[in-house]
UniProtKB/Swiss-Prot annotation:
Name this protein carries in UniProt: Potassium-transporting ATPase ATP-binding subunit
Superkingdom as given in the UniProt entry: Archaea
Similarity remark: Belongs to the cation transport ATPase (P-type) (TC 3.A.3) family. Type IA subfamily.
Organism, as annotated: Thermoplasma acidophilum (strain ATCC 25905 / DSM 1728 / JCM 9062 / NBRC 15155 / AMRC-C165)
Pfam families: E1-E2_ATPase, Hydrolase
UniProt main location, coarse: membrane
Keyword Amino-acid biosynthesis: no
Record gene name: kdpB
Topology of the protein relative to the lipid bilayer: Multi-pass membrane protein
């Protein structure tokens, strides 16, 4: 298996060396053209009038080999990155299996192949069966094993309204789903397509750096060609092979060789977090984020609010209030609704559909912020205090004080209104995620503004915000508020990142510079976002920002190191090539007396440094959250100063080794 992987990467390396492929990397294209010219000079030295003694022919052969290895190692780094992308695609393709689906036809289940399903089909899935296609749960509930897609070993509870992904497995109960995609356009199909497309796109910064490197390369090409012309003018014959070595030493081959690999590695590293990025631009944007918009539930808190206590209003019987809560939650298939039913049941109250005859269900929406039951003469509604007061024009000092007390404990108060009066309050509790305070502190240390949007009241929002150290919060938030925050921050020339999972989040996700949609969210949210988290963990937005910073720093660090390398190589190559000018001996700081061995030593270093930097290009520079000024100082010291010192030491050691081995040309 490992041999096949090495063989595939070797073939991919050879493919990347083809001129029609490598031409997209101007620096390495020029290096490859120099290789072809070197082969020609070695084969026909008399054509260019260069020395053709045995000593020089050995030197020419060494140059040919080293230039070949330079191009080979560059192509290999890209092939290794592309190999990882292919592995991700192959792992996703393994999940596409054909299974039998139980489709409802004329009221009865009929077995068909999953490839024959169509969007809108109603399908029954039984315990321990593979879910045949993407869909929405319309009846029943059960735990679904999504480990093959998300990597999460714990089964996830799915209730009415939740989405399920084809190829995952139902491990309990029975559910009925409505297919939301045709075969070939399922979630996994789209993920495969996204991975394939993402690897081929260059980011704006990468394009800008490529243009800069191309311009630098063109300047040095003109300088080298000018030396050839000037030498002829003064009646001297320049050694073309020496000029090729000078050119390769002058141009930024190190970053030129590794730049494509860094770009592809960015997509791969995001995939390691179980996140699919639609483009490299999204990852790059993550490194420049100024404002991050966070949801409270699921991001700052654990996200599994449970009913822990019911408080009846003054004059309302306990059992009667428990019954109201159970009735209002009977058709509420959210985890919160189910927990309210369970709490009522633990207090001896059970209700059935018979008890709801004559009532119609009012589903919860993020706009209204309430749900419940109503009939011609009766209604029981539960929701946020702000929404209920606004809708039903009710007020009660005791209830409001109770809601404030619950909020100050970090809980969520759900008041219940019965026929124009507050009947009581349900208390939900959701714990703050362990470590989230430290993560937010790291975000703020990078000068990133943190804003929390929550549907909870002012007191709860203020409590949570103070607990974790947020810069700003928006209480009683509606989906439009997220969009307004995105617009406001962008008008201030700030780059914005946010998380969303609902259709009403789609406009804000599309407008944000980094929009992270949840895998269990709606199709509209996934299409609007530029990243999708397969684990549906909103906290990962912070990981994406760290990763974006790391990728930008890696590219900058390697560019700094490459250019610093070139400066050092000038002090080796130029005195060696122009040894006939004694005045240049003062810059021969390494005291390399044999010019050809000195040039060869520099070229060997130029080649092997690419190999040593491949792991850094693929893995990224270690990033610790800090201010931009501290980061700049650190990179200049390590990669700037290091880029100058390392070549001096390495080239001197290589020179001494060659001389010790008797390589004296």
């Amino acid at each position: 298996m490992n041999f096949m992987k090495v063989y595939e990467e070797f073939l991919l390396t050879l493919k990347n060396m083809r001129p029609d492929v490598i031409i997209h990397n101007p620096v390495m294209f020029l290096t490859e053209m120099s290789l072809f010219l070197s082969v020609f000079i070695y084969a026909f030295p008399g054509f260019f009038g260069v020395p053709s003694s045995t000593t020089y022919l050995q030197f020419y052969l060494a140059v040919v080999i080293l230039l070949f290895l330079t191009v080979f190692f560059s192509s290999m780094s890209t092939a290794m990155s592309e190999g990882k992308s292919k592995a991700i695609t192959d792992s996703l393709k393994k999940f596409k299996t054909e299974v039998t689906a139980h489709v409802i036809r004329d009221g009865n289940p009929v077995d068909v192949k999953s490839t024959d399903l169509r969007k809108g089909d109603i399908i029954v899935v039984y315990r321990d069966e593979i879910i045949p296609i993407d869909g929405e749960v319309i009846e029943g509930s059960g735990y679904v094993d999504e480990s093959n897609v998300t990597g999460e070993s714990r089964a996830v509870m799915k209730v009415i309204g939740d989405t399920v992904t084809g190829s995952t497995r139902l491990v309990t109960d029975k559910i009925k789903i409505r297919a939301t995609a045709d075969p070939g356009s399922t979630f996994i199909d789209k993920m495969i397509d996204l991975v394939n497309r993402a690897t081929r796109e260059k980011t704006p910064n990468e394009i800008a750096l490529t243009v800069f490197l191309s311009g630098l390369t063109l300047i040095f090409l003109i300088i080298t060609a000018s030396i050839f012309s000037i030498s002829h003018y003064y009646g001297r014959t320049a050694n073309v092979m020496m000029l090729i070595v000078l050119l390769i030493a002058l141009i930024p081959t190190t970053i030129g060789a590794l730049l494509p690999a860094i770009g592809i590695a960015a997509i791969n590293k995001v995939s390691e977090y179980n996140i699919i990025a639609k483009s490299g631009r999204a990852i790059e944007n993550a490194g420049d984020i100024d404002t991050i918009i966070l949801d409270k539930t699921g991001t700052i808190t654990i996200g599994e609010r449970q009913a822990v206590r019911m408080y009846p209003n003054k004059g309302v019987d306990d059992k009667e209030f428990y019954r109201m809560c159970a009735l209002a939650s009977f058709y509420d298939q959210t985890k919160e609704g189910i927990s309210i039913l369970n709490l009522a049941r633990s207090n001896g109250i059970t209700v059935s559909e018979e008890d709801l005859r004559g009532y119609s269900f009012i589903p919860f929406s993020s706009e209204t912020k309430y749900s419940g039951l109503e009939s011609d003469s009766d209604y029981i509604i539960k929701g946020s205090l702000h929404a209920l007061k606004e809708k039903f024009h009710v007020a009660d000092e005791f209830i409001e004080a109770l809601c404030k007390e619950i909020s100050m404990r970090g809980g969520t108060a759900i008041p219940v209104v019965h026929n124009g009066k507050f009947a009581g309050v349900i208390e939900l509790q959701d714990l703050i995620k362990p470590g989230i305070k430290e993560r937010i502190a790291e975000i703020k240390n990078m000068d990133i503004k943190t804003v929390m949007c929550t549907g909870d009241d002012e007191v709860t929002a203020q409590y949570i915000s103070a607990q974790v150290g947020l810069d700003e919060y928006i209480a009683n938030s509606k989906p439009i508020d997220k969009y307004n925050v995105v617009i406001r921050e962008k008008e201030r020339q700030r780059m914005v990142a946010m998380v969303g999972d609902g259709t009403n989040d789609a406009p804000a996700l599309a407008k944000a510079d980094v929009g992270l949609a949840m895998n269990n969210g709606t199709q509209a949210a996934k299409e609007a976002a530029n990243m999708i988290d397969l684990d549906s963990n909103p906290t990962k937005l912070m990981d994406v920002i760290f990763l974006g910073k790391q990728i930008l720093i890696t590219r900058g660090a390697l560019t700094t190191f490459s250019i610093a390398n070139d400066i050092s190589k000038y002090f080796v190559i130029i005195p060696a090539i122009f040894y006939m000018f004694p005045s240049l001996s003062m810059v021969n700081v390494l005291d390399l007396t044999d010019p050809i061995v000195a040039v060869t030593s520099a070229l060997i270093f130029n080649t092997i440094i690419i190999v040593f930097l491949i792991p850094l290009a693929l893995g990224g520079v270690k990033y610790k959250p800090t201010s931009i000024s501290d980061l700049l100082k650190r990179n200049i010291m390590i990669y700037g100063l290091g880029g100058v010192v390392v070549p001096f030491i390495a080239i001197k050691l290589i020179y001494m080794l060659l001389v010790a081995l008797g390589v004296v040309w």
